Structures are given as structure tokens and as C-alpha cells.
Amino acid sequence: MTVKWIEAVALSDILEGDVLGVTVEGKELALYEVEGEIYATDNLCTHGSARMSDGYLEGREIECPLHQGRFDVCTGKALCAPVTQNIKTYPVKIENLRVMIDLS
């Protein structure tokens, strides 16, 4: 499979310890800054229709604002009920102070 890096946002758009919702080529994503690294997941919770970008980020864990299920943003792993299905993650790289996402 060919890697397709797409520019998402400027690195400066993602605040330290925060989450940012973006749409890249029609796909809703959540971008996270965790300890100086940027991570990307789908923006919709696997349990309901809540946007992860409206959730609470604590360390590596994002809490869904609807039912308080949590995911590890680095791996996508579902961490507690009611979520049981992992959330999709996407490779990220920084190039010229721009956040690039691999959607392939």
C-alpha cells in the first residue's frame, strides 16, 4: 500500500496537552498533543456519535464526552466501558512545521 501523506494543520494549531478536531479530505479526525508528540484518531467515538475533540484529554487518554469511555490516543485501545471497540489511529509526521497524516 502506498503511503499518502496529507497536510492537516500547522503544528502551532495544536496546543500543548490539547485535542483539536479537523477534517482532512472529508474525514473527521482528532489530533492530540501528548508529551511533545502528535497523534491522530478518528474523531467519532466507536460507542456513540460523540466527537472525541469535545472530550477530555488526560495524558495519553481521551475521555468521550457522551458516556465517559476512554481510549489510549497513541494506540487507539479502548480502555474502559462502555467502549469496547478500539478507535482507528493514523500515522503522523511533522514536515516544515506542518502536521501530516497518512490516510492510506
Swiss-Prot record:
The gene is ndoA. Keywords: 2Fe-2S, Aromatic hydrocarbons catabolism, Electron transport, Iron, Iron-sulfur, Metal-binding, Plasmid, Transport. Belongs to the bacterial ring-hydroxylating dioxygenase ferredoxin component family. Binds 1 [2Fe-2S] cluster. It comes from Pseudomonas putida. One of its GO terms (biological process) is catabolic process. Component of the naphthalene dioxygenase (NDO) multicomponent enzyme system which catalyzes the incorporation of both atoms of molecular oxygen into naphthalene to form cis-(1R,2S)-dihydroxy-1,2-dihydronaphthalene. Functions as an intermediate electron transfer protein via a specific interaction with iron sulfur protein components (ISP) (NdoB and NdoC). Also able to catalyze the cis-dihydroxylation of biphenyl and phenanthrene. It holds the Pfam family Rieske. Pathway: Aromatic compound metabolism; naphthalene degradation. [2Fe-2S] cluster binds at residues 45, 47, 64, 67. Residues 6-101 form the Rieske domain. This is Naphthalene 1,2-dioxygenase system, ferredoxin component. GO terms for molecular function: 2 iron, 2 sulfur cluster binding; metal ion binding. It comes from the Bacteria. Its cofactor is [2Fe-2S] cluster. The naphthalene dioxygenase (NDO) multicomponent enzyme system is composed of an electron transfer component and a dioxygenase component (iron sulfur protein (ISP)). The electron transfer component is composed of a ferredoxin reductase (NdoR) and a ferredoxin (NdoA), and the dioxygenase component is formed of a heterohexamer (trimer of heterodimers) of three large alpha subunits (NdoB) and three small beta subunits (NdoC).
